[in-house]
């Protein structure tokens, strides 16, 4: 049986955070696809092998929640984990209404992200 890669896509306009999440996920057995913008991800979405999308709520002038809604409208069912430094309850509510499987407030500990990935629905293989 061929080895099945477990790919997680991360979208964050902060390159330091993007790189840190890439290293964290790689250290825990995940392959990563790293995108610095909503448009960068959308350009690659048709070839993405991601089992989960981790997206920042605020992507510069773009909105990660709008990205998730756009993907859902197009029929994509990949689970989304939102992260943000915005601690307003209204942001968390909007993210959950957009279908988030998890919502992480920055700064968050690595275990919170890993636990969110481990709790993905069946069929979303975890290393």
Describe the residue ranges of each PLM region:
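The feature encodes the CheY-like receiver
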Residues: 18, 60, 88
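Acidic catalytic/metal-coordinating carboxylates
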Residues: 36-37, 63-66
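Active-site beta3 strand of CheY-like receiver
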Residues: 48-55, 59
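Alpha4 helix (beta4-alpha4-beta5 surface) of REC/receiver domains from two-component response regulators
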Residues: 66, 87-102
């Amino acid at each position: 049986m061929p080895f099945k890669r477990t790919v997680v896509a991360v979208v964050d306009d902060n390159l330091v955070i993007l790189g840190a999440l890439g290293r964290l996920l790689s250290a825990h057995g995940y392959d990563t696809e790293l995108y610095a913008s909503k448009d960068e991800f959308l350009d690659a979405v048709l070839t993405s092998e991601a089992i989960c999308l981790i997206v920042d709520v605020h992507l510069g002038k773009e909105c990660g929640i709008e990205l998730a809604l756009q993907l859902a409208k197009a029929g994509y069912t990949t689970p989304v984990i939102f992260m943000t430094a915005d601690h307003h309850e209204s942001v968390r509510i909007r993210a959950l209404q957009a279908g988030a499987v998890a919502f992480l407030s920055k700064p968050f500990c690595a275990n919170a992200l890993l636990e969110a990935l481990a709790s993905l629905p069946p069929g979303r293989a975890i290393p």
